[in-house]
Amino acid sequence: PIAKAIVYFVISKLNNIYEQLPKQAVNDDYVQIRHFTIIDEAHYMLDFDNQPLRNLIAVGRNKGLSIILATQNMDSFKSKYFDFLANAQYPLIMKQQSISDSIIKDLFGVTGREFQEIKSEIAGLQKGELIIKDNTMAMLGLGGKMYKKIKVTHLI
């Protein structure tokens, strides 16, 4: 409870700071990222109506804030208070304690064989491996998978 209160307080303060900032700089070559906020064990921050976190996601989006919410339970992102997955620009999936069929289907827009393939890939992920949504080939009409499997040695 104390840790939750501290994170809640910090998120509220970040909201105050980011509301005052101008929009992030964007041009053809780059997008300015001012700050990363990483919340590990994020399920503790997603299981209640966390207005400061929802505001931070909304405000931070065009102010150069990148928020990483990490949890081993993907169901946490489908909170009854807020759909965090719908607001995720780059959802990354690492090894999970349990795999939610509905979240995989919603996130990747797959059914049947493609769904079973992604689910199997997630179940087989090893330390340092992740799956990222990547429908580039499909959008170009070239077929291909709706995801990429990546080996990560350093996140930041």
Please state what every model-predicted region is:
Residues 1-117:
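Conserved P-loop NTPase motor cores
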Residues 5, 121-156:
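Conserved P-loop NTPase motor module
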